[in-house]
UniProtKB/Swiss-Prot annotation:
Subunit structure comment from the entry: Binds DNA as monomer. Belongs to the TFIID complex together with the TBP-associated factors (TAFs). Part of a TFIID-containing RNA polymerase II pre-initiation complex that is composed of TBP and at least GTF2A1, GTF2A2, GTF2E1, GTF2E2, GTF2F1, GTF2H2, GTF2H3, GTF2H4, GTF2H5, GTF2B, TCEA1, ERCC2, ERCC3, TAF1, TAF2, TAF3, TAF4, TAF5, TAF6, TAF7, TAF8, TAF9, TAF10, TAF11, TAF12 and TAF13. Component of the transcription factor SL1/TIF-IB complex, composed of TBP and at least TAF1A, TAF1B, TAF1C and TAF1D. Association of TBP to form either TFIID or SL1/TIF-IB appears to be mutually exclusive.
Lineage, uppermost ranks: Eukaryota, Metazoa, Chordata, Craniata, Vertebrata
PROSITE patterns in alphabetical order: TFIID (PS00351)
Protein name: TATA-box-binding protein
Organism the protein comes from: Mesocricetus auratus
Low complexity bias: start-end ranges: 106-117, 125-135
Gene transcribed to yield this protein: TBP
């Protein structure tokens, strides 16, 4: 009897040399699902391509959504800028000074990456004039405190003779090369030079200044000089007033740097140089205002009406 025939059927393949590579029972391998024998069978996954396509589609959809959101944000910013610009033009047409705040400064260009759409709070603000109604009137009239006028007497003068013979006259050529003369009515002071020029100061009105200059010329005539009254002219007018509220000078000088200077260590007042009319104002924290440099009274009043809305915008609220 053959030895191979005595073996069970499932072991006959293993016992024969030819059957060593031909197993008698199916062999399961994790690398070969349900393969028979030792011949490798390729693994086929029909769902792998569809999964990759779905992932690519999802990524494309997400990118499209992000682009749409950025476009919507840019469009919203542009609309806000257009609306603020129209509001400012409307305010300018109504006589108001347009305002500019941080929330109205927007970026309309396409923004890459994580660039913020709105500026940071540290963005510097453009200096502007505080907005107040143009029709608002202060109701305050500056009072004239001093008027400086000049006149030409038209002749050479001997200052020593004038100082010796005239009343209320003093002359010290080492200190000042002019005779200083004073009268009581109107209460003024005159500086008389040897060239015949005279400066009159201290008058409270134009009429008082002219009257005082004529009185000084008459005194010189009585001393024997052929004095005349030529080329009378007001050179400077000084006025003052009180706005009745304290003023933030630090904020005023920051927003009007090209017109003002403020050095509290040197002088307690803010110096404001107005362009039109050409007036210099001294503004104090207490609310007192001094106006100088005017040739006519109307310039004093006009300058104060121009500066009053600005001062009201910097009123202290404490």
């Amino acid at each position: 009897m053959d030895q191979n025939n005595s073996l069970p059927p499932y072991a006959q393949g293993l016992a024969s040399p030819q059957g060593a590579m031909t197993p008698g029972i199916p062999i399961f391998s994790p690398m070969m699902p349900y393969g028979t024998g030792l011949t490798p069978q390729p693994i086929q996954n029909t769902n792998s391509l569809s999964i990759l396509e779905e992932q690519q589609r999802e990524q494309q959809q997400q990118q499209q959504q992000q682009q749409q959101q950025q476009q919507q944000a840019v469009a919203t910013a542009a609309a806000s800028v257009q609306q603020s610009t129209s509001q400012q033009s409307t305010q300018g047409a109504s006589g108001q000074t347009p305002q500019l705040f941080h929330s109205q400064t927007l970026t309309t260009a396409p923004l890459p990456g994580t660039t913020p759409l709105y500026p940071s709070p540290m963005t510097p603000m453009t200096p502007i004039t505080p907005a107040t109604p143009a029709s608002e009137s202060s109701g305050i009239v500056p009072q004239l405190q001093n008027i400086v006028s000049t006149v030409n007497l038209g002749c050479k003068l001997d200052l020593k003779t004038i100082a010796l013979r005239a009343r209320n006259a003093e002359y010290n050529p080492k200190r000042f090369a002019a005779v200083i003369m004073r009268i009581r009515e109107p209460r003024t002071t005159a500086l008389i030079f040897s060239s015949g020029k005279m400066v009159c100061t201290g008058a409270k009105s134009e009429e008082q200044s002219r009257l005082a200059a004529r009185k000084y010329a008459r005194v010189v005539q009585k001393l024997g000089f052929p004095a005349k009254f030529l080329d009378f002219k007001i050179q400077n007018m000084v006025g003052s007033c009180d706005v009745k509220f304290p003023i933030r000078l630090e904020g005023l000088v920051l927003t009007h740097q090209q017109f003002s200077s403020y050095e509290p260590e040197l002088f307690p007042g803010l110096i404001y140089r107005m362009i039109k009319p050409r007036i210099v104002l001294l503004i104090f924290v207490s609310g007192k205002v001094v106006l100088t440099g005017a040739k006519v009274r109307a310039e004093i009043y006009e300058a104060f009406e121009n500066i009053y809305p600005i001062l009201k915008g910097f009123r202290k609220t404490t």
